[in-house]
From Swiss-Prot:
Residues carrying Phosphoserine: S2, S5, S201, S225, S243, S244, S245, S319, S366, S369, S373, S540
Region (Interaction with NEK7): 1-421
Transmembrane parts of this sequence: none
UniProt protein name: Ankyrin repeat and SAM domain-containing protein 3
PROSITE patterns xrefs: ANK_REP_REGION (PS50297), ANK_REPEAT (PS50088), SAM_DOMAIN (PS50105)
Designated gene of the protein: Anks3
Domain of life: Eukaryota
């Protein structure tokens, strides 16, 4: 739905009034075309400020439905306006109100692949298994549209993958297999769905994939299902047309559940002009040749009986909002008018959604974008035309011969080209193997139940897996398959044949090398990611170590300062002790003092006055102060080893000793 979303060019629209094209010659005043925005219109075109103003006023019913039965939340969910959906959900709107067809906002978001919106809705209590009037759940809608990531998201959210719709008895796996969505089928198989469930007609998902020509899905499902006896597939009573030995291999037209046909958001300006005829004075404008503006592509039928009554004429198929859609789709439609007008059953690729499933295509299903169904879906209408014509000539040959050269669509004014005479090709696998000299390998293919139709879909790796290991026969088979798919005549000379075979071999070798390079690139990305994680871990460890080192350095500096202070106090204590001892000796032994030489004066390092000038009480007090300072420093250096009471007791002991010495 991304190609139809107006998110890409929304700023260009905000400066323009809401008006519509009424055709050439319609005289409409500007005042008649200026329409005020209501809540539903603002939610549909992404006018966040208008919706915010309506919510803040609290005068409007945010769950009110318009004439079509849609609420503002439905429009925002369908088109993909995440911010508006979030705003409405915060305002408390109901998330399970259905449309007249029974479709909830979750179903509308799923049908368009809006994963973020689906996530918001589920967070607000949206019912995952709610069904519409057809019995389809949200998983059915995104499966039918081919939105791979939405299917994966719903499966991870707990959606029931084995639910069945009541009309045909289809399961989501059957819908994906019949539509040709390989990756979605792979998701279902990995999720563990039941592969042997049958619909009301008795067909399984594998049979439906085979019926509509999706052989890759058939091979994919065979690897996830038990091997059944050949008699079950060869029975003449049931599913005889599904036998792999049917060489004509017509691709039947898939009948889809019919939807109520009415005005859609994609109907274009003509439908809007019809329902707003009152703006022209209530009169229908006269019929004249009208040319739509740039961005609206119309299909004109050159055949009177082609698509008559299907409502395909003058129908816009591109969004005029996206300029890239205008340039691509309009030019392609002008170049291929014949194909668009005479669209029949279309040969569908098993990895994409194609143009349409049948003639009775609806306006919603025929133009719905499928950006995540396949990254290779951006091919133009011209390429799809060639594919359609080639496969039509290949598979609708009534005589079973090989196709002639690919037909070319006749454009207006061009002369018909002379058709080349067709040549007769092999009608079965034995004839083909005999022509290329590999008839001895027929038994190998018969053991694997491979006929001509399946043989033409094999690759070099498939042949090697079957048992064709010799290089020569394997190269002959791949070259024959390549020539058949290109609808080319066998070369008339050996040199041309060798050149064609060499080109085919080089292409296959390049494909193998590309696959290997992609795997190596993915492995290198993983290694780079691991190295980035390791680097982040190492950097965090280094930062922690650096922080720890800085803390230890600061502690060492603090300890060094304390040690220096303690050394100074210790020197002072020694000087004080020496002076005190000298005086005590003089006081107790005066006679000895006269006989012996006097003591040398103590070194008074750091003392403000000489120690000799202090009296004994003063000297004792100074000694007590220095002991107290020493205790404080030791406690700061080694906290917790000596309690305060012990230090006080130690200081008291020293003081008493000094007093006794003085006495």
């Amino acid at each position: 739905m991304s190609e139809l979303s107006d998110e890409a060019s929304e700023p260009e629209l905000l400066n323009r009034s809401l008006s519509m094209w009424h055709g050439l010659g319609a005289q409409v005043s500007r005042e008649e075309l200026d329409v005020p925005l209501d809540l539903h219109t603002a939610a549909s075109i992404g006018q966040y400020e208008v919706v915010k103003e309506c919510v803040q006023r609290r005068e409007l019913d945010l769950n009110k439905k318009n004439g079509g039965g849609w609420t503002p939340l439905m429009y925002a969910s369908y088109i993909g306006h995440d911010t508006i959906v979030h705003l409405l959900l915060e305002a408390g709107v109901s998330v399970n109100v259905p449309t007249p067809e029974g479709q909830t906002p979750l179903m509308l978001a799923s049908s368009c692949g809006n994963e973020s919106i689906a996530y918001f809705l589920l967070q607000q209590g949206a019912e995952l298994e709610m069904k519409d009037i057809q019995g389809w759940t949200a998983l059915f809608h995104c499966t039918s549209a081919g939105h791979q990531q939405m299917v994966k998201f719903l499966l991870e959210s707990g959606a029931n993958a084995n639910v069945r719709e009541p009309v045909y008895g289809f399961t989501p796996l059957m819908e994906a297999a019949a539509a040709g969505h390989e990756i979605i089928v792979q998701y279902f198989l990995n999720h563990g769905v039941k592969v042997d469930t049958r619909d009301h007609s008795g067909a399984t998902a594998r049979m439906l994939a085979k019926q509509y020509g999706h052989m890759k899905i058939v091979a994919l499902m065979e690897t996830h299902s038990p091997v059944l006896p050949k008699s079950l597939y060869r029975s003449s009573e049931n599913y005889e047309d599904l036998s792999s030995s049917d060489e004509s291999w017509p691709v039947p037209q898939r009948q889809r559940p019919c939807r109520k046909k009415g005005l859609s958001i994609h109907e274009g300006p003509r439908a809007l002009a019809r329902i707003t005829a009152t703006g022209l004075g209530g009169k229908t404008p006269d019929s004249y040749e009208q040319v739509p503006p740039r961005g609206y592509v119309t299909f004109t039928s050159s055949d009177e009986n082609t698509m008559e009554g299907e409502g395909l004429c003058y129908r816009d198929v591109t969004s005029p909002i996206n300029e890239r859609d205008v340039e691509s789709s309009s030019s392609s439609s002008r170049e291929e008018p014949t194909f668009c007008a005479s669209l029949g059953p279309v040969w569908r690729s098993s990895s994409s959604d194609g143009l349409a499933r049948a003639q009775g295509l609806s306006s919603e299903a025929s133009i719905e974008s499928n950006e995540d169904s396949d990254h290779a879906r951006k091919s133009s209408v011209r390429k799809q035309t060639r594919t359609y014509l080639k496969n039509k000539s290949r598979h609708n040959n009534s005589d079973g011969h090989w196709p002639s050269s690919t037909g070319t669509a006749r454009t207006p004014g061009s002369e018909p080209q002379a058709e080349k005479s067709p040549y007769s090709g092999p009608q079965d696998l034995a004839t083909l193997l005999e022509q290329i000299g590999c008839l001895k390998y027929l038994q190998v293919f018969e053991e694997q139940d491979v006929d001509l139709r399946i043989f033409l879909t094999l690759t070099e790796s498939d042949l090697k897996e079957i048992g064709i290991t010799l290089f020569g026969p394997k190269r002959k088979m791949t070259s024959a398959i390549a020539r058949w798919h290109s609808s080319a005549r066998p070369p008339s000379d050996a040199l041309e044949l060798a050149y064609a075979d060499r080109l085919e071999a080089e292409m296959q070798e390049l494909a193998i090398q590309l696959h290997k390079c992609c795997e190596e690139a993915e492995a290198l990305r993983g290694q780079v990611s691991q190295e980035q994680e390791l680097r982040a871990v190492v950097e965090s460890c280094l930062l922690e170590q650096d922080s720890a080192r800085k803390d230890i350095h600061a502690q060492l500096q603090e300890a060094q300062t304390l040690a220096q202070d303690a050394a100074l106090v210790l020197d002072q204590l020694r000087a004080c002790q020496a002076e005190l001892s000298a005086r005590l000796k003089q006081h107790h032994s005066p006679s000895e003092a006269t006989q012996n030489p006097p003591f040398l004066p103590a070194d008074s390092k750091g003392w403000p006055i000489p120690l000799q000038a202090l009296s004994l009480p003063e000297l004792s007090g100074a000694l007590e102060d220095r002991v107290h300072e020493m205790g404080i420093m030791l406690r700061n250096a080694e906290p917790g080893e000596t309690t305060d009471a012990e230090w006080e007791e130690m200081e008291g002991t020293i003081a008493r000793r000094d007093d006794s010495d003085v006495g």
